[in-house]
A protein has these predicted regions:
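C-terminal transmembrane helix pair
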Residues: 128-144, 148, 286-289, 308-409
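Transmembrane-helix bundle segments that line or gate the permeation/cavity pathway
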Residues: 105, 113, 117, 148-164
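Core transmembrane alpha-helical segments of multi-pass membrane transporters/permeases
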Residues: 16-43, 56, 60, 232-296, ...
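Inter-helical loop and helix-membrane interface segments of multi-pass membrane transporters/permeases
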Residues: 43-57, 98-101, 159-183, 222-265
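Membrane-interfacial loop-to-helix junctions in multi-pass transporters
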Residues: 17-23, 48-64, 92-101, 180-188, ...
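Single conserved hydrophobic/aromatic residue that forms the stacking wall/gate
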Residues: 1-15, 19
Length: 409
C-alpha cells in the first residue's frame, strides 16, 4: 500500500485539529450560555439593553455593537455567543422579529470578522494568496465599507418601520427581570474578562472555559435565590449548588418568571442543546474530507476556471467556486484554501494583484458560510442565536450583498 505524501498527512492532521477545537468550542458555548443565564449576566444585558436602546435604532445599534466586538475579538462565533444572544433576547422583548435581529447580529459579526487582523479567515485568505495581512485588509475595505453602509441604511429604515412611534413601554419587562434576578453592572465583569482574554490572543476555548467557571462562581455569589429555586429548596447545600451548576452546564434549565416572553428567553440547553449542531459539524467534516480526498472539490473549481476567459468571468468564477464549495463541502476553510490555490495562477497570468484574489475569497467564502444551514458556520450561528438560517437569511444583507459588491468593484 502506497503511503500518502507527508504534506497530505500534515494537512489532514491540521484540519482534524481545527475541527476538534470547533467541536469543543461548541460544547463550551452551550456551557457558557447556561452559567451566564443563572448568574444573571444575560438577564443583566437584556435589562440594560431595554433601558438604554431606543427601539427605533435598535437594529442598526445591533450591527454597530456586533461590529465593534467582532473587530476586537476577530471572531464572529464569539460575537454571537456573547452579545449576540443578549441582543436577540432584547429584540424578542421589544417585539422585533427574531430573523431581523439575527440578520443584524450576523451582519455586524461578519463585518468585524472580515476586517479584524485577529480573524482566522482573514489571516488564512492572506496566507493562501501570499498577501501581506494589512494590505489584504486595506483591499477588503473597498468592498466591505460600501456593503456595511448599504446594510446600515436598510436596517435604519426597517427600525423605523418596525417601531414607528418609538413609545414602547418596557417597564413591565424591566420589573419582571429585576424581581427575579439581582441586576448589577458588576455582572459585566465576566463578559469583559472574556473579551479581554480573546483580544489578548488567549485561545478561544480557554477563554470560554474560564468564562463558564467564573459565570458559575458569580451565580453562587449574586443569584443564590436562582440556585435555590433550581435545586427545589430554600437553602441549598454545597452539593445541591454543585448539582444545579453541573445540570446548567450540561443540560437544559428553565427559569420561570411572571412574564411569558421572559420565560422563553431565560431558558438554555447547555452542552446538550449543542449536540444537534455538533453532529451536523461532524457530518460536514466527514463529507468535506471525502469530497476533498476524491478530488471533487478541485474538479468543481477547474470546471469554473475553464469558463473564465475574461477578467470579469475570472472574478465571477472565483465567487462561484467559493459558493459551490461552501455548499458542497460545508466548510469555509476548504472553500478559501481550494479556491485560492486553484485561481492563484489565473490571477497572476492576467497581471491582477493577488490582493484581488484574497479579497474575493473573503467576500464570497467567509461571509456566505453563515447563509447555508448545513455549513458549520450556518449551523453554529443558528443554534447559538436560536434563530434558523431561513429566518435570518433575507436580513443578513451584508452577507449576501458582499459577493455582488466584489463583482461590481
Amino acid at each position: 500500500i502506497r503511503r500518502p505524501p507527508r504534506s497530505t498527512l500534515s494537512s489532514s492532521s491540521a484540519a482534524s485539529d481545527v475541527y476538534k477545537r470547533q467541536l469543543l468550542i461548541l460544547l463550551f458555548v452551550g456551557a457558557l450560555a447556561g452559567t451566564w443565564m443563572i448568574s444573571g449576566i444575560i438577564p443583566a444585558m437584556v435589562y440594560y439593553g431595554l433601558k438604554i436602546l431606543d427601539p427605533n435604532i435598535f437594529l442598526p445599534a445591533c450591527i454597530i455593537i456586533c461590529s465593534i466586538i467582532s473587530v476586537a475579538t476577530g471572531s464572529s462565533w464569539t460575537t454571537s455567543a456573547t452579545v449576540g444572544i443578549a441582543l436577540v433576547g432584547i429584540g424578542k422583548a421589544l417585539g422585533i422579529p427574531a430573523g431581523m435581529v439575527g440578520g443584524a447580529v450576523i451582519a455586524g459579526a461578519y463585518f468585524g470578522d472580515k476586517l479584524s487582523p485577529l480573524s482566522d479567515t482573514t489571516n488564512l485568505a492572506a496566507a493562501v494568496t501570499k498577501v501581506d495581512l494589512f494590505k489584504h485588509i486595506k483591499y477588503l475595505t473597498y468592498t466591505t465599507i460600501p456593503s456595511i453602509s448599504i446594510t446600515l441604511i436598510v436596517f435604519i429604515i426597517l427600525g423605523f418601520l418596525q417601531v414607528s412611534d418609538g413609545t414602547t413601554d418596557n417597564t413591565y419587562l424591566l420589573n419582571a427581570i429585576s424581581e427575579k434576578f439581582n441586576i448589577s453592572l458588576v455582572l459585566f465583569i465576566v463578559p469583559l474578562l472574556v473579551l479581554i482574554m480573546i483580544v489578548k490572543k488567549t485561545p478561544p476555548l480557554i477563554a470560554l472555559v474560564i468564562g463558564t467557571l467564573v459565570g458559575a462562581l458569580f451565580s453562587l455569589i449574586f443569584q443564590p435565590q436562582i440556585i435555590n429555586e433550581l435545586s427545589g429548596g430554600t437553602n441549598s447545600s454545597i452539593v445541591d449548588s454543585y448539582i444545579v451548576i453541573m445540570n446548567t452546564i450540561t443540560g437544559e434549565i428553565n427559569i420561570e418568571t411572571n412574564n411569558v416572553i421572559l420565560n422563553d428567553l431565560f431558558s438554555t440547553g447547555g452542552m446538550l442543546g449543542m449536540m444537534n449542531t455538533i453532529f451536523l459539524v461532524i457530518g460536514t467534516m466527514v463529507f468535506g474530507g471525502v469530497m476533498d480526498a476524491i478530488g471533487a472539490l478541485k474538479t468543481i473549481s477547474k470546471a469554473l476556471l475553464k469558463w473564465a476567459d475574461t477578467t470579469f468571468k475570472l472574478f465571477a468564477s472565483t465567487v462561484a467556486s467559493c459558493l459551490a464549495l461552501n455548499v458542497s463541502a460545508s466548510d469555509q476553510y476548504l472553500s478559501i484554501v481550494v479556491s485560492g490555490k486553484m485561481f492563484e495562477k489565473a490571477f497572476k497570468d492576467r497581471d491582477l494583484a493577488p490582493e484581488n484574489l484574497s479579497r474575493t475569497l473573503e467576500d464570497s467564502a467567509t461571509v456566505t458560510s453563515a447563509l447555508i444551514p448545513w455549513n458549520s458556520c450556518g449551523a453554529y450561528h443558528s443554534s447559538v442565536l436560536g434563530v434558523s438560517v431561513g429566518e435570518f437569511f433575507i436580513y443578513a444583507i451584508f452577507n449576501w450583498i458582499s459577493p455582488f459588491m466584489t463583482l461590481l468593484y
